[in-house]
Amino acid sequence: MDKLLERFLHYVSLDTQSKSGVRQVPSTEGQWKLLRLLKQQLEEMGLVNITLSEKGTLMATLPANVEGDIPAIGFISHVDTSPDFSGKNVNPQIVENYRGGDIALGIGDEVLSPVMFPVLHQLLGQTLITTDGKTLLGADDKAGVAEIMTALAVLKGNPIPHGEINVAFTPDEEVGKGAKHFDVEAFGAQWAYTVDGGGVGELEFENFNAASVNIKIVGNNVHPGTAKGVMVNALSLAARIHAEVPADEAPETTEGYEGFYHLASMKGTVDRAEMHYIIRDFDRKQFEARKRKMMEIAKKVGKGLHPDCYIELVIEDSYYNMREKVVEHPHILDIAQQAMRDCHITPEMKPIRGGTDGVQLSFMGLPCPNLFTGGYNYHGKHEFVTLEGMEKAVQVIVRIAELTAKRGQ
């Protein structure tokens, strides 16, 4: 455990923000730097079958140290950080023995406050690693990367019985491309866990069904002084569309298993406008109903427009709820829960209000629930992680390996 914090601080010092709208994978050069560093560290650690694909997927194997019919398992984390907030020149602050109250982030006015983030009340006495208020931290998911690397070191350096352990580090998870080029067969695991969750105890195997909705609105612009009966204002049509979307079914008004419509961007002029929504729901039937609702709204608002003016709507499914794949293999969750209990952690089964690489991988034939990292408030300047939470994650990874070995002996 002595190198856990050192690894994490080294990894977050590298700018690995991914970039949307880029065809190449990985989308940024910084991700290659971390992947090459990890490859070197895996080689120094003595792992085998180390490969780094042209699409930036790094894989390696820790061979079994016991005999028996033990299934090969895997652990996966992503190296990129979110493009939503700066990940350049990350300057972490280490707050030892947190005593409560506000934590100043850097020298400005930014604070990490328990008023806004009540979870801090539960973390008294712990060591918190925060930002300086100018960048995100990168615990999502460099905490997971550091935890997997540290768990490998623990397994490698101690006589803990384990079967074959396969690890992978992926790029571009934050822009939805992380698992697209993942070779499940080459990975060689019967099942895996992404280490990409939040607070201690979280175990996630349910996620949103997700779709994107792109709306193009073509209007007609003329001089406002002579516009009566002629002008068709694309921006006004966009406003009418959004007014029809249920206001109480937005991200800021929903939680738990509740789905939502989210207007992610809107731009335009009188002549032309574009809107981008994302749709999310855990229930497949409700998910399909939300898509139909968007089509009905577009049809309603577009009714009776001049032939040269129109509303075009394109819906694309992004991913589905991995629950249907994971529940076919209940032992995967049983082992993870038992590992947590053995480490004096109460498992907290909760839905992912988002997605992970494990979602796509589960539908590619690799069941892959998500383990906690000990991090909070991802994708922004209030992101932080606890050292104790990271240590617990390492313990759980090691215990999962040990329990899987016992299962096969």
From Swiss-Prot:
Binding site for Zn(2+) 1: 78, 140, 196
Keyword Metal-binding part of the UniProt annotation: yes
Major subcellular site: cytoplasm
An individual GO BP term: peptide catabolic process
UniProt enzyme class: hydrolase
Enzyme Commission identifier(s): 3.4.11.4
Keywords from the named record: Aminopeptidase, Cytoplasm, Hydrolase, Metal-binding, Metalloprotease, Protease, Zinc
Residue positions of the active site: 80, 173
Entry keyword annotation includes ATP-binding: no
A GO MF term: zinc ion binding
Signal peptide: none
GO cellular component terms given for this protein: cytosol
Cofactor binding, note field: Binds 2 Zn(2+) ions per subunit.
Localization, UniProt: Cytoplasm
UniProt-listed Pfam families: M20_dimer, Peptidase_M20
Cofactor: Zn(2+)
Binding site for Zn(2+) 2: 140, 174, 379
Catalytic activity line of the entry: Release of the N-terminal residue from a tripeptide
Role summary: Cleaves the N-terminal amino acid of tripeptides.
Assigned protein family: Belongs to the peptidase M20B family.
Stored PANTHER family: PEPTIDASE T
Protein name: Peptidase T
Organism: Salmonella paratyphi C (strain RKS4594)
